[in-house]
């Protein structure tokens, strides 16, 4: 594996970095003061990203994307991730990014016209409704939502929650248990029988649409709503989630990097006990630990991306990266808050926002504990070498 960046990738990285520094970061303050303006700000940022040729870095050229390799995407999304608005400005943020990949791989042409193409343009947002109050999520075998056949269609019944982006989403990919087995359905937000019960109050606030609770009650859909083949819902979920876990890591790496940069800048100008913070060995150790962990996290992401580019499965590598990156970035942000002291817990810097937003990363797309259990089982029972 060659760790150097070719000229094309390096130039693209620099363009994304300039876009984030010059255009995206200056808009953060507006959103921080009024989260209700986020969608308006994002529309303006997406327009500029399109003008700069940075939109849809994760999609193939025939769909209007940049046609990047996974390794190139890792570089781009890390740079975009230096602002919480960055990935959304490129239309490459969760859950839409993962849903785009799934629809591109599995949807038929009619479904692509109705759902994928508007999603690609940034006209609409989407949701992925898998997690349930009774446990389906980390353990998908607990799936309770049902899809009962009626005539030439299905009747969906059940409850979903923590569906990210639910408020304002145009449609949802819903996982329910049919006679053939777990099956995915495409359901419009305003479809009869689908009700957004509430937006769940959570500690993170920078995801447009929040995290919703959805009730499916007598929700009748036709066969055309089935995504892919009936009974393959769990397979499609893994098809979506393995790369999505990795792109989450790519984006959050950028947050860890920026938090550490802010801590370094502060340590170089702030004085205590007759010298700058940067001269205190304890602060030096904290900065060093963040550099060590973020560097290791980046290499894990790049390795998994390299395997994807070779056409290999990355279930094991994606789990390891998800655990390590989520925890490493969380620690880096925590150290940055500690180094900057009172300023770090204020909203005069984005650090307190980063702190709130990064903590859930250890939970969604599989809690660290579930991934550790899976990693351990594969290592023990498949004879994997460290």
Model segments located where?
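Glycine-rich phosphate/pyrophosphate-binding beta-alpha loops
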Residues: 96, 136, 161-167, 205, ...
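Short glycine/proline-enriched turns and hinge-like loops at secondary-structure junctions
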Residues: 68-69, 138-141, 165-170, 207-208
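A short, charged helix-loop
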Residues: 212-237
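Flexible, small-/acidic-enriched active-site or ligand-binding loops
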Residues: 142, 190-220
């Amino acid at each position: 594996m060659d760790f150097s960046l070719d000229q094309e990738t390096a130039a693209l990285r620099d363009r994304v970095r300039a876009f984030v520094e010059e255009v995206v970061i200056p808009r953060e303050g507006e959103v921080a003061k009024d989260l209700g303006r986020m969608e308006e700000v994002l529309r303006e940022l997406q327009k500029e990203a399109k003008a700069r040729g940075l939109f849809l870095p994760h999609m193939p050229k025939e769909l209007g994307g940049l046609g990047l390799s996974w390794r190139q995407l890792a570089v781009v999304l890390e740079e975009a991730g230096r602002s919480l608005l960055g990935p959304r400005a490129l239309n490459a943020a969760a859950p839409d990014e993962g849903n785009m990949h799934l629809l591109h791989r599995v949807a038929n042409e009619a479904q692509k016209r109705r759902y994928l193409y508007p999603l690609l343009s940034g006209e609409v947002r989407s949701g992925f409704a898998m997690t349930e109050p009774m446990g389906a999520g980390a353990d998908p075998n607990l799936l309770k939502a049902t899809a009962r056949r009626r005539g030439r269609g299905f009747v969906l019944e059940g409850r979903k929650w923590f569906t990210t982006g639910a408020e304002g989403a145009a449609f949802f990919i819903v996982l329910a248990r049919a006679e053939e087995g777990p099956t995915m359905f495409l359901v419009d937000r305003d479809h009869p029988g689908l009700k957004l019960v509430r937006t769940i109050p959570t500690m993170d606030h920078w995801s447009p649409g929040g995290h919703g609770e959805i009730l499916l009650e007598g929700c009748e859909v036709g066969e055309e709503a089935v995504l892919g083949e009936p009974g393959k819902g769990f397979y499609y979920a893994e098809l979506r989630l393995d790369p999505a876990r990795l792109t989450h890591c790519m984006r959050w790496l950028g947050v860890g990097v920026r938090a550490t940069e802010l801590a370094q800048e502060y340590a170089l100008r702030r004085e205590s006990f007759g010298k700058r913070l940067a001269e205190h060995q304890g602060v030096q150790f904290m900065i060093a630990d963040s550099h060590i962990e973020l560097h290791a996290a980046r290499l894990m992401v790049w390795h998994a991306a390299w395997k994807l580019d070779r056409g290999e499965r990355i279930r094991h590598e994606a789990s390891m990266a998800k655990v390590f990156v989520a925890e490493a970035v969380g620690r880096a942000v925590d150290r940055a808050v500690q180094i900057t002291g009172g300023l770090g817990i204020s909203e005069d810097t984005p650090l307190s926002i980063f702190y709130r937003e990064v903590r859930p990363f250890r939970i969604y797309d599989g809690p660290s504990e579930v991934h550790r259990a899976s990693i351990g089982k594969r290592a023990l029972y498949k004879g994997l070498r460290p």
